[in-house]
């Protein structure tokens, strides 16, 4: 897996997953850890998507944390990707290409997590995430732009972050 093809935020999400595994005394990086990483580093992206889908982000984080706490603890050894986590990353690469992106974004990772069967997918689906609506929210978030740089996520919704819409005010 070439992480140079991931955006900086996606790389940070994977790094957060690794740190979470280590801090919890676990060894296997599961899709749940990847989802936790995406939620932690991609707040702007996930908050926008969750709001559009009518999801409670805090509830998702709570259920996810309980699920991660229930995973087996192992002392010693380096963290490694489970088959499910590896499948998530492979699918994220595929989804990125399908979206016309040059880099794997947090949105592609979220799409992949949703579509790889397992606990992380179930958590998202139980909270109300549906692929068609997720894709629609991603399109709205991106406003027709593709991920063409490693820092593309920082440009999403930049106008709404720093300006006031006088029509809405």
Annotate each predicted stretch with a short phrase.
Residues 1-169:
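Histone-fold recognition with a strong bias for associated Lys/Arg-rich disordered tails
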């Amino acid at each position: 897996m070439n992480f140079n093809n991931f955006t900086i935020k996606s790389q940070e999400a994977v790094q957060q997953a690794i740190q979470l595994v280590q801090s919890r005394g676990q060894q296997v990086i599961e899709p749940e850890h990847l989802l936790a990483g995406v939620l932690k580093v991609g707040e702007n992206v996930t908050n926008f998507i969750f709001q559009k889908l009518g999801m409670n982000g805090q509830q998702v984080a709570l259920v996810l944390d309980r699920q991660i706490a229930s995973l087996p603890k192992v002392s010693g050894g380096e963290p490694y990707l489970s088959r499910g986590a590896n499948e998530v990353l492979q699918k994220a690469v595929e989804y990125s290409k399908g979206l016309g992106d040059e880099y794997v974004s947090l949105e592609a990772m979220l799409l992949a997590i949703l579509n790889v069967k397992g606990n992380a997918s179930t958590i998202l689906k139980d909270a109300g995430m549906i692929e068609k609506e997720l894709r629609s929210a991603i399109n709205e978030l991106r406003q027709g732009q593709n991920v063409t740089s490693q820092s593309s996520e920082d440009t999403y919704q930049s106008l709404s972050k720093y300006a006031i819409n006088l029509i809405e005010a």
